């Protein structure tokens, strides 16, 4: 007499359906979190850019004062190649020709049409477009009276300013 073993390997239909349901639940929870994380990263990048621009502006102002040059900084993109490329020319103190130093170590590109989470520049006003709402948040290097203050102040909506500067 011959014995045959009936060994079947594989998953039952119930097990496969159970795994598919669990994967669906996990995907439903994870995908919205990943989308929010990307927007949070864009906001963090904008905050970092703002802090870097403010530090560079303060440093440039102090360098000019130390050299006895009180020429106001009127632009952060004097060459028009990006949002924060080079400062406007200094006064060329001590017989030196006027120079324009870089604002940041990298060029921040201008927004493409319809872009979000990017910068636009039209000195003395610089605008950031929020990634989620598309709201414009404006920053200026002029004070309310039109004087070039050497500060990079948020002049837009208070809530949007708070989001980017705190």
Segments and roles (model prediction):
Residues 84-119:
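Long, low-complexity, serine/threonine/proline-rich intrinsically disordered regulatory regions
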């Amino acid at each position: 007499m011959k014995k045959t073993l009936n060994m079947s390997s594989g998953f039952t239909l119930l097990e496969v359906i159970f795994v598919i349901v669990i994967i669906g639940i996990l995907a439903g929870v994870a995908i919205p979190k990943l989308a929010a994380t990307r927007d949070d990263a864009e906001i963090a990048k904008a905050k970092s850019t703002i802090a870097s621009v403010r530090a560079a502006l303060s440093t440039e102002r102090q360098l000019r004062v130390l050299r006895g040059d009180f020429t106001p900084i009127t632009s952060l993109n004097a060459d028009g190649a990006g949002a924060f490329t080079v400062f406007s020319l200094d006064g060329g103190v001590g017989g030196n020709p006027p120079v324009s130093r870089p604002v940041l170590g990298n060029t921040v590109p201008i927004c493409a049409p319809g872009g979000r989470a990017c910068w636009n520049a039209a000195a003395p006003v610089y605008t950031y477009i929020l990634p989620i709402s598309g709201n414009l948040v404006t920053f200026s290097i002029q004070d309310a009276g039109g004087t070039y203050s050497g500060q990079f102040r948020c002049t837009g909506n208070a809530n949007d300013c708070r989001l980017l500067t705190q």
